[in-house]
């Protein structure tokens, strides 16, 4: 089943189970974060690479608002949960993207498992 969620494009890659500290300053994203935080909703972070928005992103949730500033800016912790693929996107009346998303599953092969094991062994040396 596909879901429509708010989208936050950023120049970073958010991975499942990772936690990031973000500074929210744009008016449209302050509205989005206030919405998802008060309702407990999830939202998606997609990477912006070379001015292009990725179709693959990570569903996340605001874990904590660390600090709020006089003009409504805020520092927040977000946690990634699972990856998604963007199907359709639109800009809502508050100016931020909302996208219809579906779960994204990596195609795993024996080659990728071998490469992963080699990389891990090099870090263990």
Pin down the residues of each PLM region.
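N-terminal low-complexity, acidic/polar interaction/targeting segments
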Residues: 1-125
């Amino acid at each position: 089943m596909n879901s429509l969620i708010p989208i936050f494009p950023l120049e970073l890659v958010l991975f499942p189970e990772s936690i990031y500290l973000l500074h929210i300053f744009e008016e449209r994203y302050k509205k989005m974060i206030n919405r998802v935080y008060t309702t407990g909703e999830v939202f998606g972070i997609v990477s912006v690479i070379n001015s292009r928005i990725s179709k693959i992103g990570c569903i996340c949730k605001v874990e904590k608002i660390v600090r709020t500033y006089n003009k409504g800016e805020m520092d927040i912790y977000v946690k990634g949960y699972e990856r998604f693929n963007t199907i359709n996107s639109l800009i809502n009346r508050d100016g931020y993207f909302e996208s219809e998303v579906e779960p994204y599953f990596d195609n795993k092969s024996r080659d990728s498992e071998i490469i992963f094991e080699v990389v891990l062994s090099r870090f263990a040396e």
